[in-house]
């Protein structure tokens, strides 16, 4: 067992991820459990990238842990399911049934219909009804404006056969109007508009550019125009943080991948504290780490970046 990896230590319950000066509130602290890439599978096997065989159990543990932290909301940054099968959505709902806090989610590319599906994936409209107050959405949590966007599907269907994402023009218009009224915005979307060159440089066999936001310029300009301090994304399965032009982009850890964790986001008078909360047992973490280490070059590149990130926390 790799005892030098912090999350293989059963006594390591949480790890500070980052402290940001903004967003902040005038008094009330808002506490959010931010999960991403849960990839719930009904009949799944372990792969170098995802612990499909443990996803339901990991999600249930995360919900129980979040309940114990008295969070105000449970927020998911996309890819709730393995491949959007109705049975996977049913299992997801079963595993989050015990959540004390209200749940909100944005869709990931694995949650929407795709051209190569061998099953009938529920339409985006159902996702918006069941897991959000519509899409896009603005949801007030105390003094915080939680803003959720859909980057997994566009009206023209251009994303139906790919894994990258895009925020549609209609959503950008809505976002421009909405941010003009938001006092303390926290924006959540599945696909990350800022790239991860640290990972791409390590894996020549992995086309990272096709897995990000396809046309990020207008989106990033809009966030900059409204001085949005924090954007939380998922999708890449590598916990990271990047600053650019006043914006901090956080890629949340994937619950289905090493280090089998979620983020606790606490927004208060002194700014925002992000804490990494692992929910995998020691054996789960060891297995997840070793599966990634035995994978292809891009799996090992993701693992090495994640490993270095964990060792150097907080950002």
Language-model features, listed with the residues they occupy:
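A short C-terminal boundary segment appended to hydrolase-like catalytic domains
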Residues: 1-18, 27-28, 269-315
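N-terminal active-site segment of His-dependent metallophosphoesterases
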Residues: 1-89
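Extended active-site neighborhood of metal-dependent phosphoesterases/phosphodiesterases
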Residues: 5-24, 86-181, 222-224, 264
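Beta-strand-turn-beta hairpins that frame and shape the catalytic cleft
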Residues: 21-34, 138-148, 180-186, 243-249, ...
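Acidic/histidine-rich helix-loop elements
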Residues: 33-57, 112-130, 155-167, 203-208, ...
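Active-site neighborhood of phospho(di)ester-bond hydrolases with catalytic His/Asp-centered motifs
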Residues: 34-36, 73-79, 103-109, 187-190, ...
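Active-site environment of divalent metal-dependent phosphoester hydrolases
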Residues: 41-42, 81-87, 107-117, 153-159, ...
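Conserved beta-sheet core of the metallophosphoesterase superfamily
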Residues: 97, 200-280
């Amino acid at each position: 067992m790799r005892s030098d990896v912090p999350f293989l230590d059963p006594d390591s319950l949480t790890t500070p991820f980052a402290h940001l000066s903004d967003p902040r509130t005038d008094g009330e602290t808002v506490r959010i459990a931010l999960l991403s890439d849960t990839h719930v599978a009904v009949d799944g096997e372990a792969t170098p990238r995802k612990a499909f065989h443990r996803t339901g159990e990991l999600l249930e543990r995360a919900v129980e842990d979040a309940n114990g932290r008295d969070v105000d909301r449970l927020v998911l940054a996309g890819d709730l399911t393995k491949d959007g099968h109705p049975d996977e959505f049913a299992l997801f709902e079963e595993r989050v049934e015990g959540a004390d806090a209200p749940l909100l989610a944005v869709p990931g590319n694995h949650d929407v219909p795709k051209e190569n599906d061998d099953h009938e994936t529920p339409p985006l409209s159902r996702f918006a009804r069941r897991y959000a107050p519509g899409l896009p959405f603005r949801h007030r949590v105390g003094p915080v404006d939680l803003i959720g966007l859909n980057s997994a599907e566009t009206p023209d269907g251009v994303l139906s056969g790919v894994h990258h994402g895009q925020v549609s023009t209609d959503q950008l218009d809505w976002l421009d109007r909405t941010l003009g009224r938001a006092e303390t915005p926290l924006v959540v979307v599945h696909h990350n508009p800022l790239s991860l060159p640290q990972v791409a440089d390590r894996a020549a066999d992995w086309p990272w550019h096709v897995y990000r936001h396809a046309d990020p310029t207008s989106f990033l300009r809009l966030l900059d125009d409204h001085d949005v301090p924090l954007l939380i994304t998922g999708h890449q399965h590598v916990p990271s943080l990047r600053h650019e032009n006043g914006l901090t982009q956080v890629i949340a850890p994937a619950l289905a991948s090493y280090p089998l964790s979620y983020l606790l986001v606490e927004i208060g008078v002194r700014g925002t504290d992000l804490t990494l909360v692992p929910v995998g047992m020691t054996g789960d973490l060891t297995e997840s780490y070793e599966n990634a280490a035995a994978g292809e070059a891009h799996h090992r590149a993701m693992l090495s970046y994640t490993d270095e990130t964990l060792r150097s926390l907080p950002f």
